[in-house]
């Protein structure tokens, strides 16, 4: 793990090998008569990083201008349904472990924490579901407009501003909160090497149907 954080290409010589143990992000190579595994860390390549950043900046600026009327309509819908601000800021962990303030359309009621705690007290069987993935299939905090925004992922659109400022990327591991560091385990070091993304592999591979372990696995695969 340490070598993968320092070098863009790492060759591993296993002590033991049995068929079926090769992770799909490594490539078998042969050095002499020895079977080795080559791990390519593409996101440590400065050229790839520069190209990715250029694409992020171009697409986010052009896309933001194109969808501006949609953003205005969404803002009006939020204000008409419930009181409170249109946008919601949340602290997440960004590149290098720095605090990242992500911007989203508000999809919950203003007293969301109070509503959540009351709901969990009245439905103790759902506490385990919440503690496992920090998600509920039928979340009582979410407004009607918010439910639609989340289903279509339109609540993430304001994060284009985070992308323009270089705090996020269009594609990458989803930004996590402090409480999720333990769940990430050894993969957290890999997570902090890149900019979090507006979308990522696990969002297009199953969303809420995936376990947290599967989400981490897909994020790590993308980084490698």
Each model region followed by its residue ranges:
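N-terminal hydrophobic signal-anchor/signal peptide
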Residues: 1-68
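Hydrophobic alpha-helical segments characteristic of transmembrane helices
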Residues: 6-16, 155-163, 204-207
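C-terminal terminal-structure detector
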Residues: 137, 165, 182-224
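Short, glycine-rich, amphipathic interfacial segments at transmembrane boundaries or analogous
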Residues: 24-27, 87-140, 199-217
